């Protein structure tokens, strides 16, 4: 009550921000005539002038009004597009590192040119992040005309791009690319064996398009680079044959072997199911007779059993995946697109392959991973834009520290959003949808029907075909024609069925989009300029007639066939209609058999329908029902937020360790000579070995001198007469013995260095160190995965799983560093180098792996659960040696030796993980 009163008096926080930005808009508009009077050369010269002013100490905020006015004028001259006042406000919101919520069709792509140009002037690079390669390429070419006109270089990074081209793209002032490619390039840069192989610069400023999709939906799925692990695929085939013999329980108390929790997306074996599974495994020869499924030696069988159960009970063909060219291809849950080459982790993909009877490929081992949450938080400044962010504003603020600002529309929004209609059954719902589509088609109104899966998409298509209604289908299988289908979805009588969010980023123009046809005429060399102009004018007139016809019929009508878990995704579907003040309408059709209602709201809605005594085939349309559905969606949104927050809390532990490893790795690559580091490591390891045989503060009678002599000879190739030293020098005590052994080891190593020369030895030291660091880091990632999957069980022992995870992860990390030191020290002491070729051979074996895959692992896998996993895979192309030197720039702040160690131990960095340096 008090909040509402204060808002009325002072306005909301959003209103106050818009008011502040509007003052700057007035200043920009005042410069329009002056900037407009400049010649093209003078306008281009403004870029150099701004750069000089920055060099002299000017702040970007001081340049903002004039820089925005320059970009606006360039847009008018190059593209014939003038930035509206609301786009100027949006540009300022992005420049301030906030999220701009802007309705579909209001010109987000053009708006981004303002902050991108301003921030590119500083010379540190600006990254524009899109959801797919098509949009990255389109926007780089389209908006790149403005940047290039103003003397700003533009690059685009694509998934199959040559290494040298990618370096050049990152070196440009402004770079366009996908979220996946930026993340994978960061991981690849931290797997290189030479500083010149890196592609990225400092992570300065990122503008994320469709920020809700990338930072919320895809935040649940870590980016993973993996390589094939050794293993026999036969076990998947044999396990798959057993799964159909296990019986699914109808409910918790009914007989059966396993239950399926759709809400948590888990499969659980009952006690009877556990015994039945053991018998079947013994009969098949997978489980040795007389042993238990949960014996340590059989733990892998449990992994395979649950993977098989999930593959059969939770993952369905044409919904979660399709079969294409004899391979299981994942369908992206959020966009409906095919994710060619992506693979689910933890054996799930192999289990699905076994279920479908296609060739089973080997499991993967994680080489490097990061979540989008941790990747994008590394940018010095982060901003985003979308048509639907307000429902997730709290999460953006909590996780990323990003404020959401709702930008006013250029023209009032007049779309009519009708109330949901709820039916008892799917059949009744689809009959009502067909009737609505028929009505629109008869009136000449275009319709866009949104479905949640390929299965529903194709079901509706078959129903329309039966009714002899011509239509176009857009799902993952028609991915190549996506932009073309979406562009023409606004033509009169056009019926388009699309999976949710497919085609996002391409506007649906009422009357159809004439631009592709215009482009074809412009590029036709057989036509004269006058013929081109005449044909374009003729087409423009035809389009205007169609456009006016659609406006008269009520604009684009949106039909939702099911509510999504997130209100935001429903709003995105609705947002395809009513762009830039156009008319439009929308309605969702639901049934009690829909997944969301069945799992979260069926009892409440069913009881409402019974109270209202609804007859068969009759729809319910009531605020109570709408409220019940919204409450169900809020429940799911809150649950998903908790999962993402939990994932981040766990991943932060790995992220702190990743920062330490990557910083040390980068320092290794940059160092010409790491002798000081290897000498300190060797001394450390020798002290540990000596302490095992000569305990600290012990008397000489407790010393195991012969054991120490053997250990030094076996592990460090040091043959020392320790007993003779002690007999000849009675004053030789524990500390001086330590010192004598370390000096002897250093002398032996110095002899090796003199033998081959310091430069060759330094090169070898670095190669060995990198090899050991990378190998142990990969093994450590696997250990963290295993730890995380079982950590929730600590709750039964009244322990906090998160605290236990932090503690054990720290112990694993410390143990890994000790193993690296020991391995490097022993290798360097044992090696006999005779030529530079031997060193090069060692370095050659440690080149970046070539047969790797890039994928998203399911976010619940990271927490010991699984849901809607996605993965991406492409072979790394042969890396060419870069033509241009790329200076190393540290990612994030350097950790000082006396700073607290980022691993969370509470010790100083130099006394903890800084010891490796």
Swiss-Prot record:
Highest taxon, organism lineage: Bacteria
Secreted is among the record's keywords: no
Xref: Pfam families: P-loop_SecA (PF21090), SEC-C (PF02810), SecA_DEAD (PF07517), SecA_PP_bind (PF01043), SecA_SW (PF07516)
Family: Belongs to the SecA family.
Quaternary context: Monomer and homodimer. Part of the essential Sec protein translocation apparatus which comprises SecA, SecYEG and auxiliary proteins SecDF-YajC and YidC.
Job of this protein: Part of the Sec protein translocase complex. Interacts with the SecYEG preprotein conducting channel. Has a central role in coupling the hydrolysis of ATP to the transfer of proteins into and across the cell membrane, serving both as a receptor for the preprotein-SecB complex and as an ATP-driven molecular motor driving the stepwise translocation of polypeptide chains across the membrane.
Protein's recorded name: Protein translocase subunit SecA 1
Origin species: Nitrosospira multiformis (strain ATCC 25196 / NCIMB 11849 / C 71)
Lineage: Bacteria, Pseudomonadati, Pseudomonadota, Betaproteobacteria, Nitrosomonadales
Gene: secA1
């Amino acid at each position: 009550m008090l909040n509402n009163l204060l808002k009325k008096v002072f306005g909301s926080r959003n209103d106050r921000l818009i008011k502040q930005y509007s003052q700057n808009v007035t200043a920009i508009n005042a410069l329009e005539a002056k900037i407009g009077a400049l010649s093209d050369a003078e306008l281009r010269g403004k870029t150099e002038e701004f750069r000089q002013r920055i060099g002299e100490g000017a702040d970007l905020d001081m340049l903002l009004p004039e820089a925005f006015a320059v970009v606006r004028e360039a847009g008018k001259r190059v593209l014939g597009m003038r930035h509206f006042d609301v786009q100027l406000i949006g540009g300022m919101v992005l420049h301030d590192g906030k999220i701009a919520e802007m309705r579909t069709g209001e010109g987000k792509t053009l708006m981004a040119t303002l902050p991108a140009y301003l921030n590119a002037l500083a010379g540190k690079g600006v990254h524009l992040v899109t959801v797919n390669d098509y949009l990255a390429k389109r926007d780089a070419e389209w908006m790149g005309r403005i940047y290039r006109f103003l003397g700003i270089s533009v690059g685009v990074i694509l998934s199959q791009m040559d290494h040298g081209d990618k370096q050049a793209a990152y070196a440009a002032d402004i770079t366009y690319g996908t979220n996946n490619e930026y993340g994978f390039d960061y991981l690849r840069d931290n797997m290189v064996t030479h500083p010149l192989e890196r592609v990225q610069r400092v992570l300065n400023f990122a503008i994320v398009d469709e920020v809700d999709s990338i930072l919320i939906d895809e935040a649940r799925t870590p980016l993973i680079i993996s390589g094939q692990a050794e293993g026999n695929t036969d076990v998947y085939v044999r396990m798959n044959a057993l799964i159909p013999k296990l019986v699914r329980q109808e409910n918790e108390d009914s007989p059966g072997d396993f239950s399926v929790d759709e809400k948590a997306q888990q499969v659980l074996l009952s006690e009877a199911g556990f015994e039945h599974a053991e018998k079947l495994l013994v009969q098949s020869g997978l489980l040795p007779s007389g042993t238990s499924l949960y014996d340590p030696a059989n733990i892998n069988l449990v992994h395979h059993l649950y993977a098989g159960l999930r593959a059969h009970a939770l993952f369905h063909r044409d919904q979660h995946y399709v079969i294409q060219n004899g391979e299981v291809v994942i369908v992206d849950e959020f966009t409906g697109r095919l994710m060619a080459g992506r693979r689910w982790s933890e054996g799930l993909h192999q289990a699905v392959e076994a279920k479908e009877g296609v060739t089973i490929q080997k499991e993967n081992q994680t080489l490097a991973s990061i979540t989008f949450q941790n990747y994008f938080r590394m940018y010095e400044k982060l901003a985003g834009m979308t048509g639907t962010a307000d429902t997730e504003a709290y999460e953006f603020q909590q996780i990323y520290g990003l404020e959401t600002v709702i930008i006013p529309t250029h023209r009032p929004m007049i779309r009519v959003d009708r109330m949901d209609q709820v039916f008892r059954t799917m059949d009744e719902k689809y009959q009502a949808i067909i009737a609505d589509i028929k009505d629109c088609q008869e009136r000449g109104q275009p319709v866009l029907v949104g479905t949640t899966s390929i299965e529903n998409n194709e079901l509706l298509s078959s129903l329309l075909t039966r009714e002899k209604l011509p239509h176009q289908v857009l799902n993952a299988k028609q991915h190549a024609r996506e932009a073309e289908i979406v562009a023409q979805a606004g033509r009169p009588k056009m019926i388009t069925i699309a999976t949710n969010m497919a085609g996002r980023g391409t506007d649906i123009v009422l009357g159809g989009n004439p631009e592709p046809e215009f482009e074809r005429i412009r590029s036709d060399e057989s036509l004269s300029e006058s013929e081109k102009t005449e044909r374009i004018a003729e087409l423009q007139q035809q389009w205007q007639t169609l456009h006016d016809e659609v406006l008269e019929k009520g604009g684009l009508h949106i039909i939702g066939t099911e509510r999504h878990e997130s209100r935001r995704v429903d709003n995105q579907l609705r947002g395809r209609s009513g762009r830039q003040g156009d008319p439009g309408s929308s309605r969702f059709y639901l049934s009690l058999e829909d997944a969301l209602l069945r799992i979260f709201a069926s009892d409440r809605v069913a009881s409402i329908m019974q109270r209202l005594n609804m007859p068969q085939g009759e729809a319910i349309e009531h605020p109570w029902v709408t409220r019940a559905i919204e409450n169900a969606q809020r429940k799911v949104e809150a649950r998903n937020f908790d999962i993402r927050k939990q994932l981040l809390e766990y991943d932060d532990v790995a992220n702190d360790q990743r920062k330490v490893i990557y910083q040390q790795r980068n320092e290794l690559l940059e160092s010409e000579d790491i002798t000081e580091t290897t000498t300190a490591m060797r001394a450390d390891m020798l002290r540990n070995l000596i302490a095992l045989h000569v305990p600290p503060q012990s008397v000489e009678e407790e010393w195991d001198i012969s054991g120490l002599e053997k250990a030094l000879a076996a592990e460090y190739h040091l043959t020392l007469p320790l007993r003779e030293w002690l007999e000849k020098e009675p004053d030789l005590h524990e500390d001086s013995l330590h010192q004598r052994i370390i000096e002897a080891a250093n002398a032996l190593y110095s002899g090796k260095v003199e033998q081959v020369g310091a430069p060759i030895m330094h090169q070898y030291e670095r190669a060995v160190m990198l090899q050991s660091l990378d190998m142990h880091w990969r093994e450590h990632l696997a250990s963290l995965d295993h730890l995380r999957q079982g950590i929730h069980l600590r709750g039964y022992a009244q322990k906090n799983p998160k605290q236990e995870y932090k503690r054990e992860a720290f112990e694993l990390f410390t143990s890994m560093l000790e193993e690296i030191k020991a391995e490097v020290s022993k290798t360097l002491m044992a090696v006999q180098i005779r030529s530079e070729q031997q060193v090069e051979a060692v370095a050659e074996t440690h080149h970046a792996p070539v047969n790797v895959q890039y994928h998203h692992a399911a976010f619940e896998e990271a927490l010991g659960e699984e849901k809607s996993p996605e993965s991406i895979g492409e072979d790394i192309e042969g890396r060419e040696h870069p033509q241009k030197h790329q200076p190393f720039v540290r990612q994030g702040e350097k950790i000082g030796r006396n700073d607290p160690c980022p691993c969370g131990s509470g010790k100083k960095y130099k006394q903890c993980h800084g010891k490796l340096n």
